[in-house]
Amino acid sequence: MEIKYLLTVFLVLLIVSDHCQAFLFSLIPNAISGLLSAFKGRRKRNLDGQIDRFRNFRKRDAELEELLSKLPIY
């Protein structure tokens, strides 16, 4: 084989092995820990807090609209 083909094959193998290593050593452990914490119930979502924040946001938005409607238009 010519050197340019060997170099191309080497670079492709290097890139593929780098992606496989990143997949194996980062994605899989994170997925396993996410599944374990989901089974243990650590990641329960607090929907009441989210609903309260949404209500506060809507209230502030309405107050801002009211304030802007009272300002004169230049």
From Swiss-Prot:
Keyword Nucleotide-binding: no
GO biological process, one term: killing of cells of another organism
Localization in the cell: Secreted; Target cell membrane
Keyword Signal (UniProt): yes
Effect on the protein upon substituting residue 37 to K: Shows important increase in antimicrobial activity against E.coli (MIC=8 uM) and slight increase against S.aureus (MIC=4 uM) and C.albicans (MIC=4 uM), as well as slight increase in hemolytic activity (32 uM for 100% hemolysis)
Superkingdom of source: Eukaryota
Signal sequence coordinates: 1-22
Principal localisation: secreted
Propeptide section residues: 46-74
Keywords (A to Z) from UniProt: Amidation, Antibiotic, Antimicrobial, Cleavage on pair of basic residues, Fungicide, Membrane, Secreted, Signal, Target cell membrane, Target membrane
Lysine amide modification, residue list: 40
Tissue: Expressed by the venom gland.
Coiled-coil regions, chain positions: none
GO cellular component terms given for this protein: extracellular region; membrane; other organism cell membrane
Miscellaneous comment in the UniProt entry for this protein: Negative results: does not show antimicrobial activity against the Gram-negative bacteria E.coli (MIC>250 uM). Does not show effect on four different human cancer cell lines.
The family this protein is said to belong to: Belongs to the non-disulfide-bridged peptide (NDBP) superfamily. Short antimicrobial peptide (group 4) family.
Function: Has antimicrobial activity against the Gram-positive bacteria S.aureus (MIC=8 uM) and the yeast C.albicans (MIC=16 uM). Causes hemolysis on horse erythrocytes (64 uM for 100% hemolysis). Minimum bactericidal concentrations have also been tested against S.aureus and is four-fold higher (MBC=32 uM).
Name listed for the protein in its UniProt record: Antimicrobial peptide AcrAP2
Protein's organism: Androctonus crassicauda (Arabian fat-tailed scorpion)
